[in-house]
Amino acid sequence: MKTKKRYIELPSAFEELTPQDWKDALVVRQRMADGRVRATLADARRLTAARQLARRGVTAPRGRRTDYLLLVARVADSLTWLWRGQDDGSFTLVQDTPLQLMGEAEGLHGPASFGQDMLFGEWRLACTILTQYEQDPENPNHLRALAGLLWRPADRQGRRQAYDADGITAYVERGRRLQPWQQWGAYAWMTSLLASLAEDTYTIGGESVEFAPLFQGDGDGGKGGSLERIRLTLAQSHVFGTADEVDHTPLLTVLLKLLMDHEELLKLKKSK
């Protein structure tokens, strides 16, 4: 896009957003949720477009405000991938890939992109809290608990503190340290991870892996199955140790085991 005889790069997909771009979009969403600005899909896109341009040094020049507003409208029209409208007139901010753009927030460190550092117990509890929030979105403690579970203080090496079952109350209190827009950002990241595991292809050990079968029909992944039952079943088999040790096993390791078991079961069914 050309303006003032120079080109600027604007994002056309979530992967191209900068952390500041994502923060701006989250803040726009929160201001609308709080009733501080008019909440329409067109306004959401326009406000976000104006912030993206401002971050790249493009503001309304004196005497050329009409040209600037036309530019904002043009950029806003391209943001259908970030702000998505629904048939009922509602709209939502979309994170369609679990890249971690929030990073450190209020001194707390978030999970790695694509859940690479998540443990099974952390995932299990996050799915439970996520379900509670979606069933009762008016209760602010659900978002606080989710954010406080996923965003934790740094350890001595400066990395995110290891997961431990501190209890919902502790997670809620830690989540209070985050701003409401950051709490919703934790929710957006978690839902994008769940969708990614159910739909995308992962490369693990140089091989392509699809976890989709675990999230379909009578598979046992994500919200579709009982994660507590999976934990206890794995503990009984001692493949990862006790139930507590299962909770402290990397999420992707557990999902790979479940996928192998699922494929073996399918082979047995076909052989009969």
Feature map (PLM): residue ranges:
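An amphipathic, hydrophobic-aromatic interaction surface with interspersed Lys/Arg
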Residues: M1-K272
